Amino acid sequence: MALEIEKYGFEINGLRHVSGKESLEILKEAGFMIDVRPDFELTKLMNIEHILYYPYDEIRDHYQDLPRETWLIIVDAEGLRSKEIAIFLKDKGFSNILHLAGGVVEWERDGLPVTLDKSRRLSGSCMCQLKRREIKK
């Protein structure tokens, strides 16, 4: 049975925006979440099976590697850069593109599965001294 994508989210200028809960429903049927956050933002990981990581600064060079035959839900931290990438992919001929409205921030607010990767947390007394925190074992 084909996925009736029109029943999910809302569409603005040809791009369909979906919520986190709707994304989970869609991923049960078909598709991948494409996380475009840079490595330093990956402290909170969406704890789901079908997720691929293509950092924002690299996806334009590697978009050809993405599957075209299934739904791709583009996500970042708050939904700004991911929207830009979703539009880029549509312009490159991808027809099954969705955008996660509000990004990981809204995903977490909705109580959806998130894992905290403590090895990626930063430490430092000011922004100029930030570095990865060393985890004592």
Task: Give the location of each predicted region.
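Short, surface-exposed ligand- or partner-binding patches at beta-edge/loop junctions that are enriched
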Residues: 74-76
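Rhodanese-like catalytic fold shared by cysteine-dependent sulfurtransferases
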Residues: 1-32, 39-71, 80-137
